[in-house]
UniProtKB/Swiss-Prot annotation:
Protein name: Imidazoleglycerol-phosphate dehydratase
Record's keyword terms, sorted: Amino-acid biosynthesis, Cytoplasm, Histidine biosynthesis, Lyase
GO cellular component: cytoplasm
Originating gene: hisB
Organism: Roseiflexus castenholzii (strain DSM 13941 / HLO8)
Family annotation (CDD domains): IGPD (cd07914)
Pathway assigned to this chain's UniProt record: Amino-acid biosynthesis; L-histidine biosynthesis; L-histidine from 5-phospho-alpha-D-ribose 1-diphosphate: step 6/9
GO MF term (any one): imidazoleglycerol-phosphate dehydratase activity
Amino acid sequence: MQRAATIERQTGETNVALMLNIDGSGRVDIATGIGFLDHMLHLFARHGLFDLAVRADGDLHVDEHHTAEDVCICLGQAFDRALGERRGLVRTAHAYVPMDEALGFVAVDLSGRPYCVVDAAFVTPRVGRLGTDLIAHLFESIAVHGRMNLHARVLYGRNDHHKVEALFKALGRALDAATRIDERLGGVVPSTKGVL
């Protein structure tokens, strides 16, 4: 069974179409109109080995907030839909990823309970056209709409591009590990409650 989903979101601010294949090979086709966000989603998918296609048209004449947020809402929804009942999942995983002088850490639990904590300090207001104040909100959008517990932290670093890149790579690697099927579970839901 292919674990994939297509999400479309149309609002008065944005028009987003996103396709995710969890069991992919890292193929990407991404155009959001925000170059740095495209770059982060590209390396997220490559490090997670997810196939990811994104097309977004938004009110970038206002700012990048609505477009970036709605893309990450759709990404979270795609994970939630593609995972279905989440039977047989490893469920929890974490990853440390260095990017030159920066070190990022992400831990996830595909528990069905959305919660997000981001501990990251940035020194510049934006990287490219993406405001650094949005990074925590983007991770929160993925967590809430993906119904997952997500903790992200920049342990240290100087360059804001490197810090954000370490976090997105770590998120891809953590989700790759957490979404794997553990054959020892025999297809049951990975919870003592029997449901997620």
